[in-house]
Amino acid sequence: MEPYAGKAKVPRRKAKLRIPREDFIAESDAESYAIAIDPSGKLTWKSNAIEGEHVITVISERVSDDYLAFLQSKGVSYLFGGRADIDLSKVLVKLRKHFGIRKLLLEGGGRINGSFLAADLIDELSVLIAPVADGSIGTPTLFDVEAQRGPARNLRLISVQKLKGDVVWLRYKI
């Protein structure tokens, strides 16, 4: 999501009243949504949409009032996912309640993917394998989990498909 957010600093507000830690719904009837997990409020959105998808930012209660005011001024919806850490199960309930979202396409990196896997919130895994090998050390994996991980998940193959360029598409039920 970072390529869609600016590098500008969040403007300081003139008003010093505390903004309540309540979800802000700028738009609830969009065709589709782009959801960003940003616990500390670092993403400075250029607009409230990414390629036509309304932006929803998931934040923690520790973000600044200046950041909340910034999101509101941009028309970016935000949901609180917890005090300091994000409770992904809670966030999914809120996404369904406020936006009618029942299914997600998770396009995260290893940390986001690992967090959803550790919370047992992934039901299907879709993997594209490109015929490229770089041999890099320290490359992120598909699932990176910092916290104590749970048991390994057994996957059941749903389908295999060969695509253009010798790419293979694997789909698994988790």
What are these regions (language model features)?
Residues M1-I174:
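Enzymes that bind and transform nitrogen-containing heteroaromatic metabolites
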